[in-house]
Amino acid sequence: MKIKYMGHSAFIIEHKNRLIIDPYIETIPEVDYVLVTHAHNDHFGNTIEIAKKNNAKVISIYEIAEFVKQFNIESIGMNFGGTIDIGEKVSLVPAVHSSTLYYNGKAYPLGNPGGFVIKGNKTIYHAGDTMVFKDMELIGELFKIDVALLPIGGVFTMDIDQALKAIDLLKPKIVIPMHYNTWPIIKADPYEFKRKAEEKGVEAIVLNKDEEIDL
């Protein structure tokens, strides 16, 4: 599996399919599926444009999946505990946050926020926007996480210290920070996070925008 960081909380995961998660990006990459953790605009991003350009399916919580159908986009709605097999197994798990889309001057509350676990030859957990919560321990037990993508910017999500606690609960082999330094309000030092994570014996990788790793 390959992971490419697209900035903020956006990643492209490549295995049998090419998946993009939370596409708050300026480009329209070639993908097969668009995964949306929640409806906030810095995660929903240009989901509509990417899905239409690629004839890609949107995978998200049921309410978001239903919302995009008005744009003639195919979608797969899920809820917590659900798993689908698209060549990779995609599971929707909880997050502790909120989820409202602001679109064309209107506010659309669109279900609960979540995270995704994607299983190919490795297992990747994208936490979405969240604080640390005790059930991360259960997510780790159920899925045996190889790589955890964790927000560290604080204010709207967990900060570095909470993300370090999330490592204790999830027990991943590798962690990659996200959702930081996009704006001054979520300023954080990813290398502080890397140093402290590695003091726990967990490999931490700081990816620059457009940088890719092969697992």
Curated annotation (Swiss-Prot):
Keyword field contains Disulfide bond: no
Record flagged with keyword Hydrolase: yes
UniProt cross-references to Gene3D superfamilies, sorted A to Z: Ribonuclease Z/Hydroxyacylglutathione hydrolase-like
Pfam families reported for this sequence: Lactamase_B_2 (PF12706)
Superkingdom: Archaea
Keywords: Hydrolase
MF terms in GO: hydrolase activity
Family: Belongs to the UPF0173 family.
Name recorded for this polypeptide: UPF0173 metal-dependent hydrolase NEQ378
